[in-house]
Amino acid sequence: MKPDLYICHTAYQVLVEACRAFEAPCPPALVLSAALPGAEVLAERLRATGLFAGVRVFDEEKCGNAFQKGFWRTLLLQRVIGRRNVEKYYGFSLDGTQYRDIYIHNDWSVLGRYLQDKGLRYILCEDTFASTCADGGHQLIQRQRALPHFALRQAFGYGYLYWGDWKKVKAIETESIEKATVPFARERLLQRCQKAAFSALTKEQKALLSSVFITTPLPADTAGAVLLLTRDFVSEGLMDEETQRRMYKAVAAKHCSGGPLFIKAHPRDASDYAALFPGAVVLDRTMPSEVLNFALPFRFAKAVTVESTVLKAFEAADEKVSLTLDEALAEARA
């Protein structure tokens, strides 16, 4: 039987595909984008599980730019150059005939464009939890469809189309067909309830996933433990590093007492929280926060975050505190 191929750009996506691999009839192959922080180290831990037939890391920044200007150059050269950049210059190739199904979460990436360059059908998966069911109108898809001659572009494969609009997308996964808000016909949607997949994990499977994602030694006494989940406002241009440090110190002082402090930084947040909070347990920032729902031998008394949706699917805390950015900054000024 042919294996499946999973392509991941975030640690959450790796978690999703590891859960899928438990159900696979034969070990699947996995490709990790080097855009994922610590991709090589994570790849080694994944190989050690024996869950995958192979784990490769793909550095998309080394593949150059295939985009062309002008109608004829785009029509005749863009896909040829895209394949050449990946296969000849970077030395990476995929043979679609070797796989039963190809699953990818971010088809706007170099790897997604490479699949389109080769005409390989794929299943588009949710890039974050229940993203196909989110409110907001899915503006990226709507703006793409508002481009001139969209129907012709889609019919004849002119240029690249993302987020499920490419004509050879086999299916679009959703947490719930009933609750899906993406603008696609229902028959194009494929339901996979990730919440149910997490709940169905066995004790042994949870332990295996913990060995991949939980790399920080845990304290013996976790009574009253509090979890602070950060967001990197500095990289978003919303404040400077010093303001962010003061803000999180103030938030922790007010909301994170009563037990050991755990810090789970956003994957893009490179701040040194071990220095900011001496004695705190700083978890691997690349770890999906969803892992904490099942991987720890205890529950948190409280989980705290600022201007983030991370607590929406978080189930490992008795109390959840979600502050607005204005509220957190006001506490820093108090």
Question: Where are these predicted regions, by residue range?
Answer:
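Catalytic donor nucleotide-activated moiety binding site of glycosyltransferases and closely related
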Residues: C256-T286
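Short acidic-hydrophobic, aromatic-tinged amphipathic segments that line or gate anion-handling sites
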Residues: V55-D59, V281-M287, L323-T324
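A nucleotide-sugar donor-handling region in carbohydrate enzymes
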Residues: Q139-G224
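Extreme N-terminal starter segment of soluble prokaryotic enzymes
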Residues: M1-L5
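A short helix->loop->beta-strand "cap" motif at the edges of active sites that frequently abuts
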Residues: K118-R121, G259, D318-V321
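A donor-sugar binding/catalytic signature common to diverse glycosyltransferases
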Residues: S289-R333
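Active-site and donor-binding regions of nucleotide-sugar-utilizing enzymes
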Residues: I7-Y162, V310-K312
